[in-house]
Amino acid sequence: MDQESRDRTLFNLNNEQLVVNIPVIFYVSVCLTLGTLGNGAVVYIFYRKMRRTATNLFVAALGICDLLCCTMYMPFDIISLRFSLTFYSEFLCHLENFSFAIGTILAAGIIFCIAVERYLRVCQPFRRHISRRLAMKMVPLMFIISFLLSIPAVWVFGKRTIWTGVRGITVEVCSYAEDNIHEIYPLYYYCTLLGLNLFVFSILMVLYYRIALCVWRYKRRRMKELQKINERTREPSEEEEPNEMEERVTVPHVTMKPYKIDQLNEAFKEKEKLIKKTNIVFFIVSLVWIVSYLPHYIATLWTIVHRRGVYTKSKSYVPYELAIRSYFMSCVANPFIYGLLNIRFRRELCKIFEKIFRRESLY
């Protein structure tokens, strides 16, 4: 077959494959748009507008990690889906999978640091916490560790030659390197990543369980203390006149007037509500993170074990391709979680929209 006929055949095959890939391209495009806008807002608000705490810095770093996935990884994925049989670049293939490995490990490290910081603040309030200055040093250190741990991805992935179904026409695609397709290295690599994520997730569940237990104990202790205060206000002693008892209430290390008890109770409730909501936000972020990665690992391990993917004409092809890219949901979901559950983030986001629309109305 001459070159012109080969190019024409590949062009037609590409167009046929494009029709099959349209749902996957649409999914990636939506994730790219929402993830870029949402994580851009997360980075700006949590780094510039929120309190300068270690937690907010970690959230901004996680937003940068997701933003890089949206701006560097997803566009190449869309191009490879559009020209699935004619687009291949060995450099971009290595870069794509290398950046995925870095993002996976770095996201796990940042989410782990957030959980540790929340645990120290809630369960160990009188001990030394992670300061913002220390967090500024921890983020680059985690990036260096992620970079080093991701180096094996360069050898695992690479060029692979596949048959197009037309006699005499083969193409090169980005997949597991031909030298490794029958080896055990890809299986070891993905099992290591999956084991690392599950290990971090297990520690997160233990930490958030301890946090919830500390909050519950704090609430029970507060109720007992307020009950003692109320009993002292209602039951004056024989040595003390009732009028004197109405003027002040005395408990160990605390002296206050009766009308301030309700104010103290409300202040405790507000603080408890804030702590509880903050912990719920980061617990949901951790849960979405691990859930969004599980379909990707399951589909990938199935491919490695069976040493083949899913045929394009199969009914399970589109679900398989969506499962391979399931972790994109983690990059998109976090801004919506903050927007729904974080009042301060929602207010700052509304201010940004007000400024944008106000400028447009001036022109």
Located regions from the model:
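Loop architecture of class A 7-transmembrane GPCRs
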Residues: 7-13, 85-97, 101, 135, ...
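Alpha-helical transmembrane segments of multi-pass membrane proteins
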Residues: 32-35, 61-74, 101, 105, ...
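Seventh transmembrane helix
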Residues: 204, 280, 286-300, 320-363
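Intracellular effector-coupling site of seven-transmembrane GPCRs
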Residues: 64, 217-292, 296
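Extracellular N-terminal segment of 7TM GPCRs
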Residues: 1-37
